Amino acid sequence: MTEETITIDSISNGILNNLLTTLIQDIVARETTQQQLLKTRYPDLRSYYFYPNGSLDINGLQKQQESSQYIHCENCGRDVSANRLAAHLQRCLSRGARR
């Protein structure tokens, strides 16, 4: 018979592996139960759609570009496209009193 050397590292690795395995099994069991419940309650439920290109929303439809909306900047008084508002505010507010 060979005698195994029990060290703090081996014990801590065993405890960590047991904890991680238990956590993963718990998460998988909960998610599986939740999915089964959703399928039972809503049989026609579609899952969200993922399109890696980024041109479709979560429902699989084309994203609407709201480039026709303009917002009035109270700081500088300009009308700014809604698509560019965040970038404009960053520049506009960082200028501050330099006007």
From Swiss-Prot:
Disulfide bonds: none annotated. A zinc finger (SGF11-type) spans 71-92. One of its GO terms (molecular function) is zinc ion binding. GO terms for cellular component: DUBm complex; SAGA complex. Keywords: Activator, Chromatin regulator, Metal-binding, Nucleus, Transcription, Transcription regulation, Zinc, Zinc-finger. Belongs to the SGF11 family. Component of the 1.8 MDa SAGA transcription coactivator-HAT complex. SAGA is built of 5 distinct domains with specialized functions. Within the SAGA complex, SUS1, SGF11, SGF73 and UBP8 form an additional subcomplex of SAGA called the DUB module (deubiquitination module). Interacts directly with SGF73, SUS1 and UBP8. This is SAGA-associated factor 11.
